[in-house]
């Protein structure tokens, strides 16, 4: 998070840089704020939500960093092995957890598609070898089909001429 307060520039993770006009550039490290207890909603400013109306100048908007997972998200969380059952999934989870689970699901789906593609390639190879044993080819099929069409066209022309 990047926030300017007076002549200080807070870069997040406790790093503060003094950047006022004429001030020497120095970086100080402040201890990072403690994480809230598990189960309570997190907020981007680190504090609890305030219901005092409009916020003043220089304050950060407090946005909840946890959200309710949809049924699809729950299925992805189960499929990727993050949780063992639907009952274990909490009502609110961090979006990073959902993103990580979606990425893992995407990779698993790609691996499945790669495997199916390899299986399909082997199936085509086997069927092509069997067709060669029967002396079948696309060229012979096309020639036979066109010969049949010519015969049908000739019969239709004879029937029309009568």
Swiss-Prot record:
It comes from the Eukaryota. It is a single-pass membrane protein. The chain crosses the membrane at residues 107-127. Residues 26-69 are annotated as: Disordered. One of its GO terms (cellular component) is membrane. It is found in: Membrane. Pfam families: DUF1075. Its main location: membrane. Keywords: Membrane, Transmembrane, Transmembrane helix. Belongs to the UPF0389 family. This is Protein FAM162B.
């Amino acid at each position: 998070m990047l926030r300017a307060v007076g002549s200080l520039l807070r870069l997040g993770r406790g790093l503060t840089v003094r950047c006022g006009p004429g001030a020497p550039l120095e970086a100080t490290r402040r201890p990072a704020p403690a994480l809230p207890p598990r189960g309570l909603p997190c907020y981007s400013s680190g504090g609890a939500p305030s219901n005092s109306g409009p916020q003043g100048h220089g304050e950060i908007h407090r946005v909840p960093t946890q959200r309710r997972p949809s049924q699809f998200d729950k299925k992805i969380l189960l499929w990727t092995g993050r949780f063992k059952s639907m009952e274990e999934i909490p009502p609110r989870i961090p979006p990073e957890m959902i993103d990580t689970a979606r990425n893992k699901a995407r990779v698993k789906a790609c691996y499945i598609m790669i495997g199916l593609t390899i299986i399909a390639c082997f199936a085509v190879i086997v069927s092509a070898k069997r067709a060669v044993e029967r002396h079948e080819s696309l060229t012979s099929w096309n020639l036979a089909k066109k010969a049949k069409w010519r015969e049908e066209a000739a019969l239709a022309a004879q029937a029309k001429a009568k």
